[in-house]
Amino acid sequence: MNETNDNDIDQLIYLFSKLPGLGSRSARRIALYLLQDKDVRLKSLINNLVEIDKKIVKCKICGNIDTENICRICSSEYRDKSIIAIVETVAELWAMERSGNFKGLYHVLGHNLSAASRQNPSILRLPELLKRCFAENIKEVIIATNSTLEGQTTAYFITEYLKEHPAKISRLASGIPIGGELDYLDEGTVSAAINLRQPFE
């Protein structure tokens, strides 16, 4: 095997190691698994990634990831359209969906605010949220940001921003440890946090 090929394989391993939850050892295992049967495994993965890249878009209403401009959640007639859960990223949206206990709508912020940084709050898509609250006659807004310092900072900022709207504002409750992120919690814990949510002021 020549030096160029070595570098190419090292680059593949490096790219895998940058994926969440994967270290260098796991990245090497994945690369080896794909390369040992590249005509089937590697090409199949590449073809799927190319197709996904063509089809995946952000929902123009909530910011979810889907294959349609309006995602399946926003377009569903079975969702409770009087409740919106505010999440930091699509990962938290998926965590709440896995719990099977939330039947409302979502608003994906895409970011959070850090008390130590000077981030512009406009990154949170809050004008769009407020517009939705008025246009869709939202009765309750559930702030489902993570229990990290950044998540708490973001939650307080959202509460202040939504003061002009009469919707009830609540926060996910017990079971979410300080510093915890929804995506890493089991479905039962997320369900309990949704059911036991508290008013947030």
Curated annotation (Swiss-Prot):
Keywords: DNA damage, DNA recombination, DNA repair, Metal-binding, Zinc, Zinc-finger. GO terms for molecular function: DNA binding; zinc ion binding. Residues 82-177 form the Toprim domain. SUPFAM superfamilies: Recombination protein RecR. A zinc finger (C4-type) spans 59-74. It comes from the Bacteria. Pfam families: RecR_C (PF21175), RecR_HhH (PF21176), RecR_ZnF (PF02132), Toprim_4 (PF13662). InterPro entries: DNA_Rcmb_RecR, Rcmb_RecR, Rcmb_RecR_Znf, TOPRIM_dom, TOPRIM_RecR. PROSITE patterns: RECR, TOPRIM. GO terms for biological process: DNA recombination; DNA repair. May play a role in DNA repair. It seems to be involved in an RecBC-independent recombinational process of DNA repair. It may act with RecF and RecO. Belongs to the RecR family. This is Recombination protein RecR. It comes from Rickettsia massiliae (strain Mtu5). The gene is recR.
